[in-house]
Amino acid sequence: MKYDFSALEKKWQSRWADEQTFASSADQEKPKYYVLDMFPYPSGSGLHVGHLEGYTATDIMARYKRCQGHNVLHPMGWDAFGLPAEQFAIKTGTHPRLTTEKNVASFRETLKSMGFSYDWSREINTTDPNYFKWTQWIFLKLYEKGLAYISEVDVNWCEELKVVLANEEVDEKIADGYTVVRRPLRQWVLKITAYAERLLKDLDEVDWPENVKQMQRNWIGRSEGMEIDFELRCHRTNLRVYTTRPDTLFGATYLVISPEHPMAEKLAIAQQLVAVKKYIEQAKLKTELERTGLQKEKTGVFTGSYAINPANGEALPVWISDFVLTSYGTGAIMSVPAHDSRDWEFAKKFGLPIREVIKSPHDVQERVFDGKESVCVNSANDEISINGLDFKTAFDRMAAWLESKGKGKRKVNYKLRDWVFSRQRYWGEPIPIKHYEDGTMRPETNLPLTLPEVEAYQPTSTGESPLANIESWLYGEDEHGKFRRETNTMPQWAGSCWYYLRFIDPQNSDALVDPSLEQYWMNVDLYIGGAEHAVLHLLYSRFWHKVLYDLGVVSTKEPFQRLFNQGMILGEDNEKMSKSRGNVIPADHVLSTYGADALRLYEMFLGPLDQVKPWNTHGIEGISRFLNKVWRLVWDENTETQKTTEDKPSEAILKRMHKAIKKVTEDTEQLKFNTAISEMMVLVNELHKAGCYSRETTETLLVLLSPFAPHITEELWQALGHAESISGAVWPVFDAKLATDDVLTIAVQVNGKLRGTFEAPAGCTKEEMIESAKKVESVAKFLDGQQIVKEIAVPGKLVNFAVKPQQ
């Protein structure tokens, strides 16, 4: 019988679906394992082989944990609101719902064709009113807690898309060729800053890649500093700045405020007012990225006003520059050009003084010195001196002096800003708020608030969403009076902030999630997805989860205990797969040519899961040959009879088998799938070489291979007489004695160069290893006439002799 991947893969996918083989159990006595993918946005372009890498990895872990006796939750759904479907609707008039349904069907078919063991009874879609009812419910809870508010804010406006972008989205859209400008707009904002400290601190509680944790730490941007008041000459008020370096106050030679600072125009003297207004208008056309780039040329305008340095009484000129942002600190900074590169460049351009206050190894007039490791100089007045002090001591002494004078106070600041949450588009969750004629706002009482049908999907010219044109939906009246519904919708991130909870209890119409089910399943044991979501989805979902924790809806402080970021699979040209490059490898093409098992194995065999690696079609052909070898362990293709015997394997084969069990188990736990597959390849070759077709070894191999190649292993498992699915088979346990080699090959080096090898029994002493090494013929000649200076023995691995010529 020949291996026909097409027929048997369809057979088993159909059977798994009919029997609901992978439905999670209601048995809460079993240990649970919740393994989750970052669920996909169902785009019109379908899935390519790169998309499948993470899904394959989670499926391997789901199947592996089932065999280990865990109750596994492994669901799939669709993050289906979003701009692409709406843009398509604007071009074609096709309702986004229809486009989304079509794309979801395509994605679902591909994922099922891969044999992924999802519990499809839990499938969710963020555009389903039964789902976004609870997204709206969470929003109202945020509103009730004062964490959702309306503000007139300067937003990142994309004219082509007619939509507001979150700060975290700007870089991507600019890279895609869109124009992004700043403009004021009425927006719903979520107060994520209220959770900044918890979002930072609780990163220590999760098993995440350190680079992702660091990206979140940097984005939150906690800093300890001071707010210092500078008295404004001629204005009877103070200008408050935020600084992390009060120890450098004596070196401040000018102040800078942002163009949006409320005092920007007020500080402009008559002669400077025109220039100041012009500069402020120009700044509005720039994105924050353009304004704050380290390589950008510094621009600015002098207001004509001066402020008094509280440390030395000097009058410092007040400038306006777009590299200062109102959203961070106070929107005003003190500039110490000798010890800050940005301030130094600005001072050089505009001829401002540069004063050394940190002892520098070079002339600060020629080059900035921004190190903290030196001590203070030129920093004293009649009341305080911090000369000779290190950073921490000087910081504390200066802070205490400023506080005693009422000129400053210690302050913890964050770069993190509140989340601009609303979008001016149609295809998103309606925000369930009603605005009344008396100026009050009230929540919708009947959820879900669904989207009306519209004839045109373009945002209005005023920046409102198309919902503003649907008067029958927009206006209403209730016991509180006449109202106008909110026309902004939620961003795509909303539905993905909490979807992991809905998978636990997807049909519940009375609650977001049943408390007993939440307590059993949470938190997510393994979450796999791309690192590009580090400061977007992963931060937003942590924020919402903490709010739900405070509300008593969830029992854990963090949603995802372990996070793993898969590396990207590149095209065969070593470039990122994209239509424009023409290097996309469609998943369906590979599936029809090689089958799901070959594709799954190849993607995991390409290299370490977390590394970037290129696709190579020739490589998958080698995997196909391996699967045929596995097939031939059971079937004789010439006679179409089974080869399986009830014979006991030899001692050597048993040892090889238990070494494989140990290696595959340990590597799978660590998601080192490429080396686990390599170990199974070695075992299969050894079995064929020894002519060993024992049921014991074959069945063990099939169970080890089943998470990686489920279709062929199901078929062969059935052929060996098993009525139940291999997914319920017990994972083999290795015998430590059999998994250890009795005889080891020891390398011998002389002065670090390999000169020979010898075999030694496992457990031999260092002394025995050294004596045996000296007797190796190819080694002895390099020791002859030499003085052995040092002998090094690494048990079970190598012996190294350090030698020099005898005197």
Curated annotation (Swiss-Prot):
Keyword annotations: Aminoacyl-tRNA synthetase, ATP-binding, Cytoplasm, Ligase, Nucleotide-binding, Protein biosynthesis
Residue span of motif 'KMSKS' region: 576-580
GO cellular component: cytosol
Catalytic activity: tRNA(Leu) + L-leucine + ATP = L-leucyl-tRNA(Leu) + AMP + diphosphate
GO terms of biological process kind: leucyl-tRNA aminoacylation
Broadest EC class assigned to this enzyme: ligase
Pfam families reported in the protein's UniProt record: Anticodon_1 (PF08264), tRNA-synt_1 (PF00133), tRNA-synt_1_2 (PF13603), tRNA-synt_1g (PF09334)
SUPFAM superfamilies: Anticodon-binding domain of a subclass of class I aminoacyl-tRNA synthetases, Nucleotidylyl transferase, ValRS/IleRS/LeuRS editing domain
Residue window of motif 'HIGH' region: 40-51
Subcellular location: Cytoplasm
List of residues binding ATP: K579
InterPro entries: aa-tRNA-synth_Ia, Leu-tRNA-ligase, Leu_tRNA-synth_edit, M/V/L/I-tRNA-synth_anticd-bd, Methionyl/Leucyl_tRNA_Synth, Rossmann-like_a/b/a_fold, tRNAsynth_Ia_anticodon-bd, Val/Leu/Ile-tRNA-synth_edit
CDD domains: Anticodon_Ia_Leu_BEm, LeuRS_core
GO molecular function list: aminoacyl-tRNA deacylase activity; ATP binding; leucine-tRNA ligase activity
EC number: 6.1.1.4
Gene3D superfamilies: 3.10.20.590, HUPs, Isoleucyl-tRNA Synthetase, Domain 1
Classification via HAMAP family: Leu_tRNA_synth_B
Similarity-based family: Belongs to the class-I aminoacyl-tRNA synthetase family.
Record-given protein name: Leucine--tRNA ligase
Source lineage: Bacteria, Pseudomonadati, Chlorobiota, Chlorobiia, Chlorobiales
Gene giving rise to this polypeptide: leuS
